[in-house]
């Protein structure tokens, strides 16, 4: 008997799952599914408890959905990726598996694991798929067959390549000829988990698809005007579903095209498409420069920046107690919800690196430990952009002023007051510099003074980068 095994990883869905669709194409084959939890590996990679809770819920939904199609989901748990190789080998042997199907992961540890799996399964046909991207790594290259290092040329080449051949979405599998089966007992991951707002981050696949449709219909066209203001619900909130594979980027692209037909010509929705292309850019980069997975800066000389070791400042930043309201409100949103608005990710990252002169890798690590949408490529790309260590990053002398950033993107302080109740009585725009208002009025606030002077911090950071740049 032909037996196909689908190995689920970061692709926890039925619709538009390339590996699952390929495994189910042969109607006479027996199809099994496998998921391997690796708690120690997840801890090493700083996976957040909220993301673990999302994965746990998605796994149980997937198990039920697969059972309705007649496909049993086998759940296994081992410490790490190395141990998972033996599990795949064991499951294949126990079930006389003839073909293994899986979707590629581009991180360095995951790629090494997959090489070992294929090496171990000499009598099993292994098929991998570029499922987590719209265009696979290698499809968008320079004229010299090199990876683009600047986003705008990559974007232009990506769009040109897309117009030459639009990747289609594949349908969810039909019920196997054997009929539906009873699902196995519910899955419980052996990893710290924390609840989250399912209204913002849906668990069920159909709910994620509905959220995508609603955003593309009602939000994508206004995204350019609303995306920078954290007090406004102007972003898609789809990042968590993309990070765990509850949605595919192809689903996002096709729904966007359906609702905003002029998007490829720069019409409504094109700025949100730009964000999808940034996601592709960072994934392609990570494939060609695996050192990015090892917390190495893309620009070599920036590794010589003399970072400050200041646990008190790092803790103040993590807890939202720096004395700069827009930074603190953003960090408290992250700690409370597991999510942070993208504009605020830039502001808080810039503050940690360029006001506190703390190593960007500390921030990268902390974000991953809190984010429900934690994604190595996107998170690393964002931090290296803010720290001026990455490819096509902000220049090192670009340093956000945390006061003017608050005034620009939360003018009346609506977002700040939502997350900093101790400042709710500070009127109007005074909320951006509450220490001045407190001194003027004689009111004592239960809120810290700024832990650094921005002007002095800026000069210190410029000097540190310029010193590191010598000899570059």
Regions found by a protein language model. Give the residues of each.
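Short coil/turn segments at secondary-structure junctions
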Residues: 46, 314, 445-448
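Glycine/tryptophan-enriched, flexible segments
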Residues: 145-299, 409-410, 414-472
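Active-site-proximal binding-pocket segments
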Residues: 233-422
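A broad detector of short, well-ordered amphipathic alpha-helices
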Residues: 21, 90, 206, 328, ...
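An N-terminal domain-cap segment
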Residues: 6, 14-15, 229, 321, ...
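Trp/Phe/Arg-rich N-terminal binding region typifying the photolyase-homology
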Residues: 1-166, 268, 463-468, 472
């Amino acid at each position: 008997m032909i037996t196909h095994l689908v190995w689920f990883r970061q692709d926890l869905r039925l619709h538009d799952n390339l590996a699952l669709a390929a495994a189910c194409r042969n109607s006479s084959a027996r199809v099994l599914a496998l998921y391997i939890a690796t708690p120690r590996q997840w801890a090493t990679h700083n996976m957040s408890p909220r993301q673990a809770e999302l994965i746990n819920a998605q796994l149980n939904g997937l198990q039920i959905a697969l059972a309705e199609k007649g496909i049993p989901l086998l759940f296994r748990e081992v410490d790490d990726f190395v141990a998972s190789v033996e599990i795949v080998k064991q499951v294949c042997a126990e079930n006389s598996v003839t073909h293994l199907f899986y979707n590629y992961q581009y991180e360095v540890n995951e790629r090494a694991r997959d090489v070992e799996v294929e090496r171990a399964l000499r009598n099993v046909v292994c098929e991998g798929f570029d499922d987590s991207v719209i265009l696979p790594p290698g499809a968008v290259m320079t004229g010299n067959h090199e990876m683009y290092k600047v986003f705008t040329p990559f974007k232009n080449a990506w769009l040109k390549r897309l117009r030459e051949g639009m990747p289609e979405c594949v349908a969810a599998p039909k019920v196997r000829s054997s009929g539906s089966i009873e699902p196995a007992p519910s899955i419980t991951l052996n990893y710290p988990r924390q609840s989250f707002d399912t209204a913002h981050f849906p668990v069920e696949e159909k709910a994620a698809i509905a959220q995508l449709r609603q955003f593309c219909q009602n939000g994508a066209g206004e995204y350019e005007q609303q995306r920078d203001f954290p007090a406004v619900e102007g972003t898609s909130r789809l990042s968590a579903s993309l990070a765990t594979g509850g949605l595919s980027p192809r689903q996002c692209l096709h729904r966007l095209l359906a609702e905003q037909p002029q998007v490829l010509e720069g019409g409504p929705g094109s700025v949100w498409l730009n964000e999808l292309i940034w996601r592709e850019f960072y994934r392609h980069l990570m494939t060609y420069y695996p050192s990015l997975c090892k917390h190495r800066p893309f620009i070599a000389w920036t590794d010589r920046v003399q970072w400050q070791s200041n646990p008190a400042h790092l803790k103040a930043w993590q807890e939202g107690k720096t004395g700069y309201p827009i930074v603190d409100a953003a960090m408290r949103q992250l700690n409370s919800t597991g999510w942070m608005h993208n504009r605020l990710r830039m502001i808080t990252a810039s503050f940690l690196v360029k006001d506190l002169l703390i190593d960007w890798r500390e921030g990268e690590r902390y974000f991953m430990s809190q984010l429900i949408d934690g994604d190595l490529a996107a998170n690393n790309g964002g931090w290296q952009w803010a720290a001026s260590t990455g490819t096509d990053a902000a220049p090192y002398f670009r340093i956000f002023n945390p006061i003017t950033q608050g005034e620009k993107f939360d003018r009346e302080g609506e977002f700040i007051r939502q997350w900093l109740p101790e400042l709710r009585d500070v009127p109007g725009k005074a909320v951006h510099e509450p220490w001045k208002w407190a001194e003027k009025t004689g009111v004592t606030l239960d809120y810290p003074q700024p832990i650094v002077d921005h002007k002095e911090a800026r000069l210190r950071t410029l000097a540190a980068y310029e010193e590191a740049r010598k000899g570059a």
